Curated annotation (Swiss-Prot):
Principal subcellular localisation of the protein: secreted
Record key words, sorted: Amidation, Neuropeptide, Pyrrolidone carboxylic acid, Secreted
Protein known as: Periviscerokinin-1
Subcellular location: Secreted
Organism field: Bisanthe pulchripennis
Length: 9
């Protein structure tokens, strides 16, 4: 999901 300005790692 691209709802946050940083990627989920």
């Amino acid at each position: 999901q691209g709802l946050i300005p940083f990627p989920r790692v």
